[in-house]
Amino acid sequence: MNSLMNDDMVKIIRNGLSASQHPKHILVIGAGLSGLVSASLLKNAGHRVTILEASGRAGGRVCTLRSPFSDDLYFNAGPMRIPNNHSLTLEYIKKFKLPTNVFINRTPMDIIYANGIKTRLQVFERAPGILRYPVAPNEQGKTSEELMLSLLQPILNFINQNPARNWRIVEEQYKNHSLSSFLNTYFSYGAIDMIGVLLDMEAYMGMSLVEVLRESIFFSSPAHFYEITGGMDLLPHAFLPQLKTNILYHQKMMKMSQGENRVTIHCQHQQTAEFTSFTADLAIVTIPFSTLRFVKVEPYHSFSYYKRRAIRELNYISATKIGIEFKSRFWEKAGQHGGKSITDLPIRFSYYPSRNIGANGHAVILASYTWADEALIWDSLSEGERIQYTLLNLSEIYGDIVWSEFVSGTSFSWSQYPYSAGGFTAFEPGQELELYPYIPVPEGRVHFAGEHASLTHAWMQGAIESGIRVAYEVNRLP
């Protein structure tokens, strides 16, 4: 595999790939961000591309909901923030001249409501005992973040000394550790509970420690975050002027057949139920492995044992978001300007608008953001019940004003969405070494991209990075 450095990828975004000496017809499965990136680069390099998309829109998990909200209001059901070190995402935003604003990820006034006690982040940071977690004597007086970093920072410092070499050492050393098994070695149950609740790590307890280390590089450094003003879906939409004639919507891949010189994708139209076959020189599969499991691959041995195992075992985390529109920004009167509230109630994390702080009129908050098992409990409820329970939880923080100010709401569960069958990839212990090496590797005439085919899971950066990598790979073929 040709390894591209980050700077190489930035240059490819700016200047494109070299013009192909051997133009091909390429089928791209999925019009998510990685599919759009690879198709855009390959089309510009002289290839003929056809994008087959099962849903009725482009963007995949980059999804912004504008209904049922009032004019110009929306919430991002998928990605909602961009760390300032995600250079590939920011480079595409610059290329398309998309407007951005700062995403306020946390403030000292963030409300914490846990163990029946309501306080502010700045108060908790001065006196962590205020929340009455039953921590051990040697853990008293330390915040959840301080406890977590006391363990992770030495490992992160070691990685940063020589990332190319030291990541491998860390992967090998901690390959069998989940976050939970690692924390259990050092901390009391009370401290682990506090870390899980306040740092949103409960969902990651069963995940690979190495996965958490990759994530913590973003959150331990005081990263700034941005959002695309007007909705994150403006990024995938920016590819459409170039690619709209290349996308066929409602075409769901049911079967894939490889020959010596060609690959055929058999699709069923999601509205008419009609079957159509598309044949080309190569295919790039960008859909999640959770959905690829349902696709018949012929001949059977055209995919290696290791690829099939990765498709079967790769772990996906559920994610559910609930957005609520209110008549006014009553949370700002309570001192919450952007940032988030954290609670051990079912809603868990609420994020408040970073834009137009102090403005009058309606606004939408991301009233609940949950992952993994915490998202699954919401999946058991109807849309109406989700909104009802969200308002009940918010009223425990803000009082009855939430009922009088309520306008409308909507929710989105990525596990219940048939074209993703989960929110994002998160390795279980061992998967980084056992499965990942086989995920991005081509199988005959079939190549692979998507956030799961990168090591930057759950971020647009991972999808973009894999889209560039696969386009570069395909463009170099004879």
From Swiss-Prot:
Q: Which residues cross the membrane?
A: none
In its keyword annotation, does this UniProt entry include Signal?
no
Origin species, per record, is Bacillus subtilis (strain 168)
Which amino acid positions bind substrate, per UniProt? R81, Y369
GO-annotated biological processes: amino acid catabolic process
Q: Which reaction does it catalyse?
A: an L-alpha-amino acid + O2 + H2O = a 2-oxocarboxylate + H2O2 + NH4(+)
Q: Where does FAD bind?
A: S34, E53, R61, M80, R81, E451, M460, Q461, G462, A463
> This chain belongs to which protein, by name?
Putative L-amino-acid oxidase YobN
Cofactors: FAD
What Pfam families would the database entry show?
Amino_oxidase (PF01593)
